[in-house]
From Swiss-Prot:
The lineage of its organism: Bacteria, Pseudomonadati, Spirochaetota, Spirochaetia, Spirochaetales. Gene3D superfamilies: Bira Bifunctional Protein, Domain 2, Nucleic acid-binding proteins. This is Asparagine--tRNA ligase. The gene is asnS. It comes from Borrelia garinii subsp. bavariensis (strain ATCC BAA-2496 / DSM 23469 / PBi). Its main location: cytoplasm. It is an enzyme of class 6 (ligase). One of its GO terms (cellular component) is cytoplasm. It is found in: Cytoplasm. NCBIfam families: asnS, PRK03932.1. Pfam families: tRNA-synt_2, tRNA_anti-codon. SUPFAM superfamilies: Class II aaRS and biotin synthetases (SSF55681), Nucleic acid-binding proteins (SSF50249).
């Protein structure tokens, strides 16, 4: 039976025999004494294993197999380490190289690699300290998301990945089809989708919200957590074509309830990471973003300020700062606008509400002024928007009018209108992108490094 390195380091039994499996990170020698660092991914720190060629009968052939990247199983005595920077090491009795790695061609050597280089080998970059730390933080966030909602009476539901609806009304969707397109066709006007697999146009889902609302109208509080897809041709550090979304929907919740839930969830997740991923967070603080932990503590310890979009624009317009896009009423807030508000004005997270309806989704509840909607964005320092949501339109006639106003296909949304025809109620929800949260929590600057195998425009490894 073998043990994980994490278990050995956290519960050491000195002078006991241990067996571990893992991968060789580094190898060095001092005469007849060899030192290899083994890591199995269970923790940031590996453990040093010592080979004494004089005390043990190891063949030269076997020793040559001990190269960086090779997988190994070893048994030895756990002892206190005389070396600095580590408490324990293993004196090897026996070892077996399970999978060899050619040291000349293995791309991960004992040096710091650029993120650009590592993006070219996403299948191997997880073996670095940085991506191991990111993966463990992402895992913990995912677990804590479920924990939070289950503790608070929410039901987890699975919404479709293939859909006939454009949940955002933006039209930036990936089409799903089994039709054979023999020739490049820039127009879909001549295609009869009745011959397609589903008998109609089908797409990869951009959101689970609409289907989630249906279940909220019976279970009261639900959440979805799954992959979503956007065919948005954005080559930025904040956008990906495939990403994971957390989307709660709550019956009987008004906009202020929605904001309170979003704030509470965000603080719960960040607190959990600082408490339970301290080793990885210390590493990320030292090597990725100085001040990372203080940044997260500021979010946890702050009361989120709530301001209207109109007030935000007034603040931006009165500023002497040169923004890339000049702020004025009617445009969506840009990242530099959001960062200015959170970093220089309020110096903490804020919730911006009551956005103009002209650039918001059709399902958002319209305010009495008929110009703005009950939308809300949670903005945090250094990144800007991290959560977006709204109170949903629960009035059938108003929702029908809004759908027609935006020239959306009302027949495709007839089932969605049924939710207003039969037992409608005020309800709210929001979306939190997992990758953007991981990006913020770990301090990495590019969203491509927050997901194992990123999908972005003109980028589809494997």
């Amino acid at each position: 039976m073998f043990s994980s390195i994490k278990d050995i380091l956290e519960n050491p039994i000195l002078n006991s025999n241990v067996t571990i499996n893992g991968w060789i990170r580094t190898k060095r020698s001092n005469g007849k004494i060899g030192f290899i660092e083994i890591n199995d991914g269970s923790t940031l720190k590996g453990i040093q294993a010592v080979i004494n060629e004089e005390e043990n009968q190891f063949t030269e052939k076997d020793l040559k197999k001990l190269t960086t990247g090779a997988s190994i199983s070893l048994t030895g005595l756990l002892v206190e380490s005389p070396a600095k920077g580590q408490n324990y090491e293993i004196k090897i009795y026996s070892f077996n190289v399970i999978g060899e790695a050619d040291s000349k061609t293995y791309p991960l050597q004992k040096k710091r690699h650029t993120f650009e280089f590592l993006r070219e080998i996403p299948h191997l970059r997880i073996r670095t300290n940085t991506f191991g730390a990111i993966a463990r933080v992402r895992n913990k966030i995912s677990y804590k998301i479920h924990e939070y909602f289950q503790k608070n009476g929410f039901f987890y539901i699975n919404t479709p990945i293939i859909t006939s609806n454009d949940g955002e009304g933006a039209g930036e969707m990936f089409r799903v089809s089994t039709l054979k397109f023999n020739k490049p066709n820039n127009s879909l006007s001549n295609i009869d989708f009745k011959d397609d697999f589903f008998g109609k146009e089908a797409f990869l889902s951009v959101t689970g919200q609409l289907h989630g609302e249906a279940y909220a109208m019976a279970l009261s509080k639900i959440y979805t957590f799954g992959p979503t897809f956007r065919a948005e041709n954005s080559n930025t550090t904040r956008h990906a074509s495939e990403f994971w979304m957390i989307e709660p929907e709550m019956a009987f919740y008004k906009l202020n309830d929605n904001i309170s839930l979003a704030e509470d969830l965000l603080k719960y997740l960040l607190s959990s990471i600082l408490n339970e991923c301290s080793q990885d967070m210390d590493f990320l603080e030292n090597y990725i973003e100085k001040g990372l932990i203080k940044k997260l503590e500021n979010v946890i310890n702050s009361n989120f300020e709530v301001i209207t979009y109109t007030k935000a624009i007034e603040i931006l317009e009165s500023s002497k700062k040169n923004f890339e896009i000049k702020p004025c009423w009617g445009i969506d807030l840009q990242t530099d606008h959001e960062r200015y508000l959170t970093e220089e004005i309020f110096k903490k997270p804020i919730a911006v509400i009551d956005y103009p309806k002209n650039f918001k989704a059709f399902y958002m509840k319209i305010n009495k002024d008929n110009k703005t909607v009950k939308g809300m964005d949670i903005l945090v320092p250094r990144i800007g928007e991290i959560i977006g949501g709204s109170e949903r339109e629960d009035d059938l006639q108003k929702l029908e009018n809004r759908i027609k106003e935006l020239n959306l296909n009302i027949e495709h949304l007839n089932w969605y209108l049924d939710l207003r025809r039969f037992g409608s109620t005020p309800h709210s929800g929001f979306g939190l992108g997992l990758e953007r949260l991981v990006q913020y929590t770990t301090g990495i600057s590019n969203i491509r490094d927050s997901i194992p195998f990123p999908r972005t425009p003109k980028n589809l490894y494997f």
